[in-house]
Design a protein with these regions (language model features):
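C-terminal catalytic histidine-bearing segment of alpha/beta-hydrolase fold enzymes
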Residues: 217, 227, 231, 238-281
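Short, surface-exposed "cap/lid" segments of acyl-processing enzymes
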Residues: 65-95
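Catalytic nucleophile-loop/oxyanion-hole region of alpha/beta-hydrolase
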Residues: 83-92, 103-141, 262-263
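The feature captures the conserved acid-bearing segment of alpha/beta-hydrolase catalytic domains
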Residues: 169-184, 195-232
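N-terminal cap/lid segment of alpha/beta-hydrolase-fold proteins
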Residues: 17-66
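Primarily recognizes the serine-hydrolase "nucleophile elbow" in alpha/beta-hydrolase
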Residues: 124-189, 198-199
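Short beta-to-alpha linker loops that shape the active-site pocket of alpha/beta-hydrolase fold enzymes
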Residues: 78, 101, 106-110, 176, ...
Length: 281
């Protein structure tokens, strides 16, 4: 169902996850920060590698053994205006336990930059990441992995020329894909999208690359309008002929969804881990 039907029926509660989840959002985000500090020492490799002059143009690299099959490039969420790669360290630790190599990206945020500038900076970041991987002999296939706004970012960056013939999959967790809806929300005070830019970055009118497999996941306890974003995106991919799976995670909301999907010991996480590993075969 189109997001437009919600214009007179609670856009904020449908399309602002912090409003939808209520007090649990702050609890979850505080837990992410606390657990990420506690588990940072589980992550080997290098932190805060620069790909540009802005202080948020940084990424972490956590290599797996070179015979391991997949490298994940992660993009954090936060509605393009908040959070940090460091908030994802405990999720990265869970993925590392699964045997994946990891690149955890930061990027300049709105309103310090526009969405278009953000995507340009991240394109530079992908250039630098691929150069670093190749220089280190890390030639494994790549999966891009993103939550919320990070899912939107991953779909658009699928067109990056340095990822051609190497990007095998995208795991998009509880994403927002029709960016025009942001024009109706309070978060646009920070994101500052205009009509033309919102259209430019709509994932349905500017579809992601043909070739990678897609895993589109969303929490079963999320608002119906938000769930529809993932369903509509998965349906568009399937209609185009892409390999796309839709996974509704029963009982999970926008934030604990990430905890469960990164953890191979959770049944939803085991399914995602298996899907990612299958792409190396």
């Amino acid at each position: 169902m189109s997001w437009r039907v919600w214009r007179d029926h609670g856009m904020e509660s449908q399309f602002n996850p912090r409003v939808a989840v209520g007090n649990a959002a702050a609890v979850c985000l505080a837990a992410w920060a606390e657990q990420s500090v506690a588990r940072k020492n589980e992550l080997t490799g290098r932190f805060d590698l620069a790909y540009g002059p802005h202080h948020l143009m940084r990424y972490d690299f956590h290599p797996a053994q070179k015979d391991r099959p997949i490298i994940i490039i992660n993009f954090h969420g936060g509605y393009w205006r908040a959070l940090d790669k460091a908030d994802m360290n405990h999720h990265m630790a869970d993925l590392a336990k699964g045997g994946f190599g990891l690149v955890n990206m930061n990027y300049p945020l709105c309103p310090d930059v526009s969405m278009t500038q953000m995507m340009t900076h991240l394109g530079t970041g992908i250039d630098d990441v691929v150069k670093m991987l190749d220089a280190g002999g890390h030639h494994q296939p790549i999966i891009m992995f993103g939550h919320s706004a990070g899912a939107h970012i991953a779909l658009h960056l699928s067109h990056h020329p340095k990822l051609a013939n190497r990007l095998v999959g995208i795991a998009a967790l509880s994403g927002i894909y029709e960016t025009e809806l942001v024009l109706e929300l309070a978060v646009n005070e920070d994101v500052r999208l205009g009509k033309d830019e919102a259209y430019k970055w709509n994932c349905l009118t500017h579809m992601p690359a043909v070739g990678p497999a897609y895993y589109i996941a969303v929490g079963g306890s999320e608002p119906s309008g938000w769930i529809d974003q993932s369903w509509i995106m998965a349906e568009a991919l399937c209609q185009r002929g892409d390999s796309a799976q839709f996974h509704g995670c029963g009982g999970l909301h926008h934030f604990n969804l990430v905890d469960c999907l990164c953890d191979a010991n959770h049944h939803d996480g085991a399914r995602l881990h298996d899907w990612m590993k299958s792409l190396s075969r």
